[in-house]
A protein has these predicted regions:
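The feature captures the beta-strand-to-loop junction immediately N-terminal to the Walker
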Residues: 31-33
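Helix N-cap at the start of a conserved alpha-helix in ABC-type nucleotide-binding domains
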Residues: 36, 158-160
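Helix-to-loop junction immediately C-terminal to a conserved catalytic motif
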Residues: 46
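Conserved ABC transporter NBD signature motif
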Residues: 54-65, 69-70
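ABC-family P-loop ATPase nucleotide-binding domains
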Residues: 72, 78-135
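Catalytic Walker B motif of ABC-type/P-loop ATPase nucleotide-binding domains
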Residues: 147-151, 156
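Helical segment within the ABC ATPase nucleotide-binding domain
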Residues: 162-176
Length: 218
């Protein structure tokens, strides 16, 4: 579903060099402190930055060959980007209907109601929890095959965090071929969700293990 082979990206004060794989039907966790390189990986996979070297395979294709139609199968929630704070959910629905052929408006509106998200309120007036729920909801609203979720639970209280994680579980339960790469700087946030973990430190993968094995050992 996603394979990264020796992805290298160099900055003045930071260098990333990592490899990882996300298999169909699995939720893979990427854990590391802030500044470890998690967001750089997500940006590279989505084509938002150009790696210095390495290969990224997404949905079975080289990332350089991904088409606009292929990108419709990707769902992303990034920690450092999103819709303008001046938009409302009503505005966002209009955008999503134009962006994605498979946008499920009925599902989206149902979840908005369940989460109690204000339909006509500007995003800049949303709480942190509301913004987090909306980001993940947008990512899963168009039948994506691969979800890329960068710190979706950051800053959330226990109730809001569990609601976001349940949304991801429900998404995976609908299709066994789907996959998720999700990052956090706190491993305990993801222990009940992920099938396996990668630990990232200073731009390098220092640890990879299946969650069941990890919990048995520690």
């Amino acid at each position: 579903m996603l394979k990264i082979d020796h992805l290298v990206k160099n900055y003045n004060t930071f260098s990333l060099d990592c490899s990882l794989e996300v298999l169909p039907g699995q939720i893979t966790g990427l854990v590391g402190k802030n500044g470890a390189g998690k967001s750089t990986i997500f940006h590279a996979v989505l084509g938002l930055i150009r790696p210095d070297s390495g290969k990224i395979t997404v949905l079975g294709k080289d990332s350089q060959e991904i088409t606009a139609k292929d990108k419709q199968k990707l769902g992303a929630a990034l920690s450092d980007s999103g819709f303008s704070g001046n938009l409302t959910i009503q505005d966002i629905i209009s955008v999503l209907e134009k962006l994605y052929d498979d946008f499920n408006k009925n599902f989206f509106m149902k979840q908005v109601e369940i989460f109690g998200l204000p339909y006509k309120k500007k995003l800049k007036d949303f709480s942190t929890g509301m913004k987090a729920k909306l980001k993940v909801l947008i990512a899963i609203s168009h039948q994506a095959k691969l979800l890329l979720l960068d710190e979706p639970t950051a800053g959330l209280d226990v109730v809001a965090r569990n609601e976001v994680l349940d949304l991801i579980r429900d998404y995976m339960a609908e299709d066994e071929e789907r996959a998720v790469l999700i990052s956090s700087h706190i491993s305990s946030d993801l222990e009940s969700l992920c099938d396996d973990f990668y630990m990232l430190k200073d731009g390098k993968i220092i640890f990879h293990e299946e969650t069941d094995v990890l919990l048995d050992q520690y």
